[in-house]
Amino acid sequence: MVGYCGEKWEITPVLLGEYAQRLDAKNRLTLPAKLRSYFAEGVVVTKGFDGCLFVFPRGSWNSFVEARLERLDPFSGESRRLSRWFYAGANECELDGQGRIMLTQPLLQHAKVDKDVVVAGARDYLEVWDAEAWSRVQAESEGSVEDVAERLSQP
């Protein structure tokens, strides 16, 4: 996707798909091969909502921070809590030669990840879920997604 930001045009990745993966003995996650090029500039992993992890390409993280977090009012308690959630929980890393990233223990604990995970595209970032949690979330969403879409489309 191409977007305009101030004086500059930029290409924003659109991360799609669902991939079953397994963490190795050192808690490294292999990113799907077809998505790795989006993460060449670096990776930011942070706590996500609903018990998952958010995995941002460096450029998408910067855009997310500029659009969402930098605009928060530091005098608001809710804003400070949300900023802490993302910043304190974040970990910067690089892909290794095999396309892997290291997931820290606090991040693994947040997502209650054991070894089997699902990597799901979420437009400009990836979500990493414990495989069993992903199955539950998908089953819960299955019957209600049409109703949610209809409600959200109302003016």
What is the meaning of each model-derived region?
Residues 1-21, 25, 35-93, 97-98, ...:
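Flexible "stalk/tail and boundary" regions
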